[in-house]
Amino acid sequence: MIDFMDYIQLTFSDATHWNRDNSYTALTDTANALLDFSIPERLRVHLSSLSTPQFATTYTLGTVGLIDGSISYLFSTLPLESTPSRSTLIPLRRLVPGYRQIHPPLAPESPNESRHAEPNERSEKALQSWRKETMLHATLHLPPPTTLNGLFLRRISPTTQLSLAVCSTQATPLSKSTPQASILTQLSHDTGKYSAEFLFSTDNALLGFKGLWNFGPDPRHAATAQRPRTASQSVSLLSAGGEMYYSPLSSVVGLSTGLRFTTLPAASESTHSSSSTHPAQSPISTFPYTLTLTLTPLTGSLSTTYSLLASPNLAFSSRFGFNVYSWESEMVAGCELWRRKKKRHASTLSDKDDLSWAKRKMGLLPPLPPSPVKGTSASAVTPAGEQKESDSVIKLRVDQSLNVRLLWEGRVKDLLVSAGVGLGPSLPSIGGTTYGWTGVGVSVLYST
C-alpha cells in the first residue's frame, strides 16, 4: 500500500493529464507490483490529512524495537477539490498497486488547440492540462541523524515536466564534515508517440537518459489521435526503450534495454462486441495480459515477465531471470486476489420481496440505476442493484528458494490496514538449513 503522499502525487499527475505509463521507468510496473511488493516493517502508524485542496500533511510513527518517524508536507498550485481524502472514501485500488491496464497513448493537448476550439468545447479541465502547475513536497525523517527529502515538480509545457529531488542527511555530532546532500534533476518529455527523460545527479556527476518508443499510429496526427477515443481500433501496444547512465568521476556505465507488449482495453471488449451484428475479428485473447523483456548487456542479465488479469479480482504474474555470465537463474511467481463486499442499493428491496419487479413496472418503486460504462475501475453495479466495492486484497509471491511473502491489505472500520509475513530458509546451521519467519509487520493508515 502506497503512502498518502504518494497517493496525492498520483492524483496530481492525473489531474494534470500526465501519462505515467508512457515511460521506460514504468515498463515493468505491473510485474513489480505483483512480484516485488514489500511487507510492512514492525508496527507503523500513519496519520494524514488533506486540510485544504492545496495542502496535505502526514505524520508517521514506527515502534517495536526502534522508535522512528517522519513529518511530511505537500503543497500544490492545482486545487485537488474532488480528491477523496478520508480513509473511508479513498478507493482501495488507488492505494494498492496491482495489474495496470495500459491505455492507447494520446498526444497531450496544446494551448493552440484549446484556443482554436469552439467556446463550448473549452473546459476548465482542458485548460488546466497545459497550465504550469507546481507541486512541492518535503519529508523530515526522525530521530537524528535526520534526513530531509524534498521534491519540486513543475509542468513546463503540455509535453514537458521538470522534477528536482533533494536528499540531505545530517552529519554525526563527532564528524566535522559537511552534511551529505545530493540533487537529482529529471526532465521528462512525452509526445504520446515516444517519451524521453534526461537525468543528472550531483552524486558522482551521474548523467542518464531514458527513452520509450510506441509502435503503431502516431497520436500527434489529428486523424489518428481521434481513433482510440471513438472506435478503439487498436487492441494491443508494442513499446521498446532503453536507458543509459554514465559518471565521469567514477567511470560508472549503465545500460539496459527492454520490450513491452500489452493488450489494450479494446481487446477485453471484443467479447461484448462479438454478440452484435459486427462480430470482432481480433485474434487476441480477451484476458488482459502484459509481456516484458529486459536485457542488461554489461552484466549479462536477461529477464522476462508475464502478467495476466484472469478476472477483475484475480491477477497472476511470473518472472524468469537468467545471467549468461554466471549461469544463475531466478524464478518468481505471484498473484493477487481481491475481495468485494456487496452493499444493497437504497432503491432495492430484500431478496424475499418477489414483487419488486412488478412494483417498478407500475411506477411504485424507482427504477434500478443503469449499468456502468465499460472499463470502470474498482466499483461496479450489478443488474440486481447490488453495489460492489473492493474491500481487501491478498498478495502472495514465492521464488525458487521457497521464500514466501504473504500480504493482506484492507479496510477495518475507518482504518486502512496492511499486514504481512515473510517465510523462508534461514542461514545454514550445524543441524542444517531451517525454515522460519523472515519478517512480520503491520501498517495502519488513517486520513481525514
From Swiss-Prot:
State the source organism's domain of life. Eukaryota
**A Pfam family it matches:** MDM10
Query: Where would you say this protein principally sits, based on its record?
Result: mitochondrion
Which keywords does UniProt give here? Answer: Membrane, Mitochondrion, Mitochondrion outer membrane, Transmembrane, Transmembrane beta strand
Q: Which InterPro entries match?
A: Mdm10
Residue stretches of biased makeup (Basic and acidic residues): 112-126
Q: Where is this region: Disordered?
A: 101-126, 366-386
Q: Which GO terms describe its biological process?
A: establishment of mitochondrion localization; mitochondrial genome maintenance; mitochondrial outer membrane translocase complex assembly; mitochondrion-endoplasmic reticulum membrane tethering; phospholipid transport; protein insertion into mitochondrial outer membrane
| GO cellular component entries | ERMES complex; SAM complex
Q: Which HAMAP family match?
A: Mdm10
Q: What does this protein do?
A: Component of the ERMES/MDM complex, which serves as a molecular tether to connect the endoplasmic reticulum and mitochondria. Components of this complex are involved in the control of mitochondrial shape and protein biogenesis and may function in phospholipid exchange. MDM10 is involved in the late assembly steps of the general translocase of the mitochondrial outer membrane (TOM complex). Functions in the TOM40-specific route of the assembly of outer membrane beta-barrel proteins, including the association of TOM40 with the receptor TOM22 and small TOM proteins.
Subunit (UniProt): Component of the ER-mitochondria encounter structure (ERMES) or MDM complex, composed of MMM1, MDM10, MDM12 and MDM34. Associates with the mitochondrial outer membrane sorting assembly machinery SAM(core) complex.
**Protein name as it appears in the record:** Mitochondrial distribution and morphology protein 10
Q: What is the lineage of its organism?
A: Eukaryota, Fungi, Dikarya, Ascomycota, Pezizomycotina
